[in-house]
Amino acid sequence: MASHDKRDYQAELTDAALAADLATAAGELLLEIREEIGFDQPRALGDAGDRLANSLLLSRLRAERPGDAVLSEEAHDDRVRLQAGRVWIIDPLDGTREFSTAGRTDWAVHIALWQRTTGGVADGRREITDAAVALPARGNRVYRSDTVTAGAVTGGVPNILRIAVSATRPPTILHRIRQKLAIEPVAIGSAGAKAMAVVDGDVDAYLHVGGQWEWDSAAPAGVVLAAGMHASRLDGSPLRYNQLDPYLPDFVMCRADIAPILLGVIREVWQ
């Protein structure tokens, strides 16, 4: 397996460029792991992917941003992050189930940088300052917050809203939304793949209820917001990161033009 732990670290990389570089490197490593281990033992494949990608990212961040804190799905939660001014929120492998299944491409790598705001004002746009989401099995495509643009949409608000949901755990609120809006659920694997489908214009929204962790949505939200789209809690309040408890109960990411409509319906039916 080739080494992805760079020796010639580039201190001049911007935070956004570093996020993209890290996502790319982790994606390349995960593709190699998939090739070498194969799919006969999915649990072993997933465990190796989680562990080795996490090790790579932590090593790179220690070398290139030694003063920053890290919150990772695959590492101990060091509460020093709560006093830190800069925290990298990472998911080395988003969608372990999909990664471990032959032919699936809807898994991702998430890299986000949270920075403390001043004056007590905080929202998703200001807190997640730099982000990258890689889809390694789709040509290792990387969506980065400093270059992303939303996919072209035409014809105004669609008659039927395409909403990305979990294939295994679709949110129950969809039934109530359907009583008010014409919707088409679209099953997609990982959180990152769902959110980037919104960015690409393949779906109109990504709705999640039932809880995730900060690393599941930080980088996707950073990219979605940078693309000029909407990301918030279901009640419309800002997404908050680097919290004492990194559990995030719900969120919606969607086209900016449908956000008022979708949030309005959610307010009507959500209890």
Curated annotation (Swiss-Prot):
EC number: 3.1.3.7, 3.1.3.11, 3.1.3.25
Annotated residues for binding of substrate: E73, L93, D94, G95, T96, D216
Family named by the database record: Belongs to the inositol monophosphatase superfamily.
Annotated GO MF terms: 3'(2'),5'-bisphosphate nucleotidase activity; fructose 1,6-bisphosphate 1-phosphatase activity; inositol monophosphate phosphatase activity; metal ion binding
Designated name of the protein: 3'-phosphoadenosine 5'-phosphate phosphatase
The organism of origin for this protein: Mycobacterium leprae (strain TN)
Keywords, in A-Z order: Hydrolase, Magnesium, Metal-binding
PROSITE patterns: IMP_1
Function: Phosphatase with a broad specificity. Its primary physiological function is to dephosphorylate 3'-phosphoadenosine 5'-phosphate (PAP) and 3'-phosphoadenosine 5'-phosphosulfate (PAPS). Thus, plays a role in mycobacterial sulfur metabolism, since it can serve as a key regulator of the sulfate assimilation pathway by controlling the pools of PAP and PAPS in the cell. To a lesser extent, is also able to hydrolyze inositol 1-phosphate (I-1-P), fructose 1,6-bisphosphate (FBP) (to fructose 6-phosphate (F-6-P)) and AMP in vitro, but this might not be significant in vivo.
Pathway: Sulfur metabolism; sulfate assimilation
Keyword Nucleotide-binding: no
Chain sites annotated for binding Mg(2+) 1: E73, D91, L93
Name of encoding gene: cysQ
Residues annotated to bind Mg(2+) 2: D91, D94, D216
Reactions mediated catalytically: adenosine 3',5'-bisphosphate + H2O = AMP + phosphate; beta-D-fructose 1,6-bisphosphate + H2O = beta-D-fructose 6-phosphate + phosphate; a myo-inositol phosphate + H2O = myo-inositol + phosphate
InterPro entries: CysQ/Inositol_MonoPase, Inositol_monoP_metal-BS, Inositol_monophosphatase-like
Biological process according to GO: 3'-phosphoadenosine 5'-phosphosulfate metabolic process; sulfate assimilation
Required cofactor(s): Mg(2+)
Superkingdom to which the source organism belongs: Bacteria
CDD domains given in the database record: CysQ (cd01638)
Subunit structure, interactors included: Homodimer.
Residues in the signal sequence: none
